[in-house]
Amino acid sequence: MKTIKGPALFLAQFAGDDAPFNSWDSITKWAADCGYKGVQVPSWDGRLLALDGAASSKDYCDTFKGQAEENGVEVPELSTHLQGQLVAVHPAYDEAFDGFAAPEVRGNPSARLAWAVDQVKKAFSASANIG
């Protein structure tokens, strides 16, 4: 990007189980209606992005990006805030940070670390596929 195109919105603070915040289509329409030009996507929220699919499929990402653009916003970045924090957790914070991890790796610091690293790597691939 050579120039700033306008305000973008971090969707993690709005994503939820009720419309319009519970699906990619409706939340991107809502963001555009609010005047935003872009949306930062939380890569951990499956209601908005299937990270495994995005990491492995350019077609998935083309559809994902295309739907956002049809609704009036761009996807300037994916967020890995939660997973990234889990890549280097001091043992004193194990319990506090465990809630950021997938349920199947909670309580197991080495499994949580492996999961977090894998999530960040998948987000890199997904970001490349989105373009």
Describe the residue ranges of each PLM region.
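N-terminal pre-domain/capping segments
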Residues: 1-129
